[in-house]
């Protein structure tokens, strides 16, 4: 069966490198949403904990329950309040109109819209939001924002930073000992992080976004069959690839049902073993020159992202959670 190998030493190296930049492991919030961006949240959670990480963020209550044994603090980023929230978790408040829908005495982090205009409360409406929170039975323990253009070389990043500083100054008049976090992976290496803030790290912890980091995920496939493709014979749906000479080919057990982008046989998609995929990818398999029982499909999601004109995030998060993941 296909396999994802996670390099434990590389992951630990990345976390140490990032913690050194921030100042400590205690100021890290590891974002493990969507199965840790496809890498395997339950596999990585104990590694992060053992290094000193105590705070993580996930998408949903279901994701939080999968790793709650490992962390003291788990922030749920995309929750729709239903009145039966778990006091074990912390919930992002993305819309002030939802205050009344939460269970009483639940811990929340207030999301501030500093310019991305996706989720959160605008700075102009913060005073009203503070009044509603203070009159409710919710426990405000933190406040955060998300930078829309931290990886762009324009001024919007700095405008958002300034807006968040204004929000912090305002909320500090009414609440003390709040946990603030604004810097994400893209913002991590763009200057100094405020001393009163934590840092949310997403894809950067897995080796992307800085040349000093190490990729931790490698995708492997295993051989299903092998044959001699004779000169003039074609392989796969539509016969896109035709052999110009006799060649030994093999079919391997990964396809678009496993979360891979479907290769249509056009252009040269080079696999991690240096061989090109031959013909169209099938639902559960692909073909290439015979390279043994196990081959590396990719070690760097950027290569596939460039080929399919997308981003590395999409390549990784689409990887089927049913693919076995192991530490190496």
UniProtKB/Swiss-Prot annotation:
Keyword hit for Metal-binding: no
EC number annotated for this UniProt entry: 5.1.1.1
Active-site residues from the entry: 33, 237
SMART domains reported for this sequence: Ala_racemase_C
A single Gene Ontology CC term: cytosol
GO biological process terms on file: D-alanine biosynthetic process; peptidoglycan biosynthetic process
Family per record: Belongs to the alanine racemase family.
Protein purpose: Catalyzes the interconversion of L-alanine and D-alanine. May also act on other amino acids.
NCBIfam families per the UniProt record, alphabetical: alr, PRK00053.2-2
Record protein name field: Alanine racemase
Species of the source: Campylobacter jejuni subsp. doylei (strain ATCC BAA-1458 / RM4099 / 269.97)
Gene symbol of the encoding locus: alr
């Amino acid at each position: 069966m296909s396999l994802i190998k996670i390099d434990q030493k590389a992951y630990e190296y990345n976390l140490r490198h990032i913690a050194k930049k921030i100042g400590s492991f205690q100021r890290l919030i590891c974002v493990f949403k969507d199965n840790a961006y496809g890498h395997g949240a339950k596999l990585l959670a104990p590694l992060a904990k053992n290094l000193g990480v105590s705070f993580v963020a996930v998408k949903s209550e279901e994701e939080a329950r999968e790793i709650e044994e490992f962390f003291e603090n788990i922030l749920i980023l995309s929750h729709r309040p239903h009145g039966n929230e778990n006091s074990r978790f912390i919930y992002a408040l993305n819309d002030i109109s939802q205050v009344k829908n939460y269970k009483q005495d639940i811990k929340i982090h207030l999301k501030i819209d500093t310019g991305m205009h996706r989720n959160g409360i605008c700075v102009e409406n913060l005073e009203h939001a503070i009044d509603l929170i203070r009159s409710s039975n919710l426990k405000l323990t933190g406040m955060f924002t998300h930078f829309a253009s931290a990886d762009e070389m324009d001024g919007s990043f700095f405008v958002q930073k300034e807006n968040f500083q204004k929000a912090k100054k305002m909320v500090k008049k009414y609440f003390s000992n709040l946990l603030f976090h604004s810097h994400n992976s893209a913002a991590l290496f763009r200057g100094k992080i405020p001393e009163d803030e934590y840092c949310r790290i997403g894809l950067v912890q897995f080796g992307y976004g800085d040349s000093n980091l190490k990729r931790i995920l490698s995708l492997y496939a295993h051989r299903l069959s092998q044959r001699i493709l004779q000169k003039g014979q074609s392989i796969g749906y539509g016969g896109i690839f035709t052999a110009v000479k006799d060649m030994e080919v093999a079919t391997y057990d990964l396809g678009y049902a496993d979360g891979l982008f479907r290769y249509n046989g056009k252009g040269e998609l080079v696999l991690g073993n240096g061989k090109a995929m031959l013909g169209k990818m099938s639902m559960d398999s692909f073909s290439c020159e015979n390279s043994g029982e196990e081959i590396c499909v990719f070690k760097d999601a950027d290569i596939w992202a460039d080929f399919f004109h997308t981003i590395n995030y999409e390549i990784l998060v689409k990887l089927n959670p049913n693919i076995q993941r192991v530490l190496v």
